[in-house]
Amino acid sequence: MSCKVRVIPKRDSNPAVLACLIAWIIFVFPVKGDQTIPQWHRLSDKPIISPRGNGWESAGTFNPAVVLRNGTFIMLYRAQDNTGSSRLGYAESTDGIHFTRRPEPVISPEAGYEKDGGVEDPRLVKFGDTYYLTYTGYNKKDAQLCLAESKDLIHWERKGVILAAYKGNWNVGWTKSGAIVPEKINGKYWMYFLGTSSDKTDQTGLAYSTDLIHWTEATREPVLPKRAGKFDSRVVEPGPPPIVTQDRIILIYNGADDRLVYRTGIAMFDRNDPTKLISRSDDPLFFPAMDWEKTGQVPNVVFVEGAAEKNGRYLYYYGAADKYIGVATAD
């Protein structure tokens, strides 16, 4: 099965640059009309990480961030206990599929904006020798987008809330899911994020910063809005940090329909103007199919948050039914 993306031709696309990207990035080459792109397939029919024990990761292990460090896949994942409080666990792998976990979380709820609810849904990006972690701080009242930094991915320094809830240009609710573009553009850092519009649907906005700590919304409306009748009619939520090519920003995102079935989409923005949407997938690349993706704490969910490339192959890590972690690719 495949899906289609409506593509606007771009004469200066560079195949040599794009060839090293994911298999489905072929659609950014200059073509006219519809271009068929392959859907992802699972590298394991079973979860690669599951809940365990009776403690901090007993109820759910899901929504992972992944980076490659010195040839090793490093994963930070959301772990939930039986009270519903979340922490971030740490795991390592040499092949990207079989992970060894640390026995204790690397981040636990400590700040007031995290108390009771916890730290949720990590995403990782690196600038220089520092890793930056965006995550949701949830205190059982508000969910807000937060930042922490680290040199070793184990010891983290909090930088606080970076986009406050209820205070956006168009967002009237919580802030979540900060996917930072891994390169500065026009002298600024850019971040796609989730906000809630006045009609109570969740959509994707864009913010910019000069220091990664103080952020300003770039627009007065979502840059990746919902679409009636599509797989993303109710929720349009950023996935992993985007991939940057010569002239494109490629954003994997998570879409939910009116029945709150979560599937995976892809959008393409102008590299020189991150607010400018060029195209997006008409149909999902990936969707719940396995029993453990359909049944869990929240049914019918695949939610991609991590992506890592090794030896020319991209692996995509996702939460399944808010309980498990899976991995997929497109080759």
Predicted regions and their residues:
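Short intrinsically disordered, low-complexity coil segments enriched in acidic
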Residues: 1-3, 27, 262
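N-terminal secretory signal peptides that target proteins for export/translocation
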Residues: 1-12
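Bacterial N-terminal signal peptides
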Residues: 19-27
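Beta-rich carbohydrate-recognition and catalytic domains
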Residues: 33-117, 125-234, 243-300, 310-331
